[in-house]
Amino acid sequence: MAAYSSVSTFLALRSDRRLGELVDAAVPLGSGIGGRSALLKVDGKPVFVKRVPLTDMDLMPEHVRSTANLFGLPTFCQYGVGGPSFGAWRELAVHTMTTNWVLGGQYQGFPMMYHWRVLPDSGSALPMELADVERAVAYWGGGPEVRRRIEALQQSSASLALFLEYIPHTLHEWLTEQVQADEESADRACSLVEGELEAGTSFMNACGLLHFDAHFQNILTDGRR
């Protein structure tokens, strides 16, 4: 917890300008439908940074931190399968919940969030899945609300920066390595995955959180949890 407190305090005390400079200088890791990610270090400790685009609608005072479906999207768009999604504030809400569970000793199976900040950001293009706006609108039902959401993302001038505990592997990568190693490693890994997924899912559901994007490339592991 001392390391968490140190990193959290360091980030919280940076001005928007200084924090933006740190994020801009971070090592890029990738980008996709959920935003862009990078790796920075605070006193030698790796910190995973995720930037999720915020629309002008998200930034209206009455909508800040709202998890509502502001654009009136079809409900199937909330699944993380390449759709326009419901908004960045939902992601913040989830990380706030899971971090507090870890800090409160209720469940240790989530990466902790050190800090979050809204930062100016106009350098991101639409992700590949939405880049062809006409095609994406048609694929997701053709409704005007879908078009408004995608075009709002396209015109985004800010992002939600989430500063998270760095977990080195996706479950997909790690499990593939274990299965290819030998039978004993594969059995041990499969047992760990089954137990952790069952425990984590049961805990989240009991606390009122339902995860719609729990595929193996969106689950992280350090080989122990």
Positions of the model-derived regions?
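Catalytic activation segment of kinase domains across protein kinase-like and atypical kinase folds
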Residues: L126-P127, E134, L210-R225
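Conserved ATP-binding subdomain of kinase catalytic cores across diverse folds
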Residues: S15, G20-L162
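Protein kinase catalytic-loop region centered on the HRD/HxD motif
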Residues: T201-L209
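Activation segment of protein kinase catalytic domains, centered on the conserved DFG
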Residues: V179-L192
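Structural motif in protein kinase domains
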Residues: I167-Q178
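C-lobe/activation-segment region of protein kinase-like
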Residues: E184-D187, A206, R224-R225
